[in-house]
């Protein structure tokens, strides 16, 4: 086996391991956790020796005073003085660190708000149009790099394929709080501005096509890229996001 093939296999195995860790984490019930000794970076600036405490569902307290950290931990049933999970400086970032019901020492690592992405088509060689497995791997790739929530962008395809892809996104949302919904980039694009989209699949947004997509989405459609200059483009701008009654 060539060296490049071996490296590719190792990469795929590493990605699958991380995706499995994400699956396990999402399947577990929410539990309190805390992170301490982090370098916090957000819109307010940079702060050293920062900590965060969550009850499992929401952040309940943040700060940089040790006494306040102990009190915040106690409020969610954690002991700030127990041995904590550690994030070593040599950690490659390819594994999820810490655990539910734990106190994690960030060892000076950076802590930022989770990113929310509203336009990306995939990651790690997988597309959000590639079904449940494709979404699973692509979301793991984004999650590893800090995107905690995401609107999944779907490209122009035959209408029945786009409807099926919307149904897949809708079906995953109940078990995947990290999936915020779907973004349709197409099929209602101008031929002159189509980019890499298949021109054979581009359509004018007549009510029939719009209703089919809305029905398939089941309420998961968050945004759609359209060309308002199309014959029915302006009409689409005034369309309710809920499908019309049959």
Give the ranges of each region predicted by the language model.
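N-terminal metal-binding scaffold of metallo-dependent hydrolase/deaminase domains
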Residues: 3-75, 84
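Single conserved hydrophobic/aromatic residue that forms the stacking wall/gate
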Residues: 238-246
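Divalent metal-dependent hydrolysis catalytic cores, especially in the metallo-beta-lactamase
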Residues: 121, 136-165, 178-191, 217-231
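Conserved phosphate-binding/catalytic loop of the ribokinase/pfkB sugar-kinase fold
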Residues: 190-215
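Generic structural signal for well-ordered alpha-helices
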Residues: 139, 166-170, 210, 237
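Acidic, metal/ion-coordinating pockets
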Residues: 205, 218, 231-237
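Short amphipathic alpha-helices and their capping/turn segments at secondary-structure boundaries
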Residues: 76-79, 107, 165-176
């Amino acid at each position: 086996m060539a060296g490049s093939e071996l490296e590719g296999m190792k990469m795929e195995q590493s990605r699958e391991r991380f995706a499995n860790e994400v699956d396990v984490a999402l399947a577990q019930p929410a539990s309190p956790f805390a992170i301490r000794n982090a370098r916090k970076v957000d819109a307010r600036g940079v702060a050293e020796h920062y900590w965060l405490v969550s009850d499992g569902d929401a952040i309940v307290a943040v700060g940089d005073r040790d006494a306040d950290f102990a009190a915040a931990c106690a409020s969610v049933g954690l002991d700030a003085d127990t041995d904590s999970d550690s994030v070593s400086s040599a950690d490659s970032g390819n594994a999820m660190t810490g655990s539910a019901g734990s106190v994690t020492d960030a060892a000076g690592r950076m802590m930022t708000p989770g990113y929310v992405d509203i336009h990306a088509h995939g990651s790690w060689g997988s597309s959000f149009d590639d079904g449940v497995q494709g979404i699973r791997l692509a979301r793991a790739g984004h999650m590893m790099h800090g995107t905690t929530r995401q609107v999944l962008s779907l490209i122009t395809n035959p209408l029945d394929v786009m409807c099926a892809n919307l149904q897949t996104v809708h079906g995953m949302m109940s078990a995947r709080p990290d999936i915020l919904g779907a973004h349709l980039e197409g099929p209602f694009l101008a031929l002159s501005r189509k980019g890499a989209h298949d021109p054979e699949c581009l359509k004018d947004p007549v009510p029939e096509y719009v209703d089919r997509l809305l029905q398939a989405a089941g309420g998961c459609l968050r945004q759609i890229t359209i060309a308002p200059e199309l014959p029915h483009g302006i009409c689409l701008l005034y369309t309710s996001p809920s499908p019309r009654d049959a």
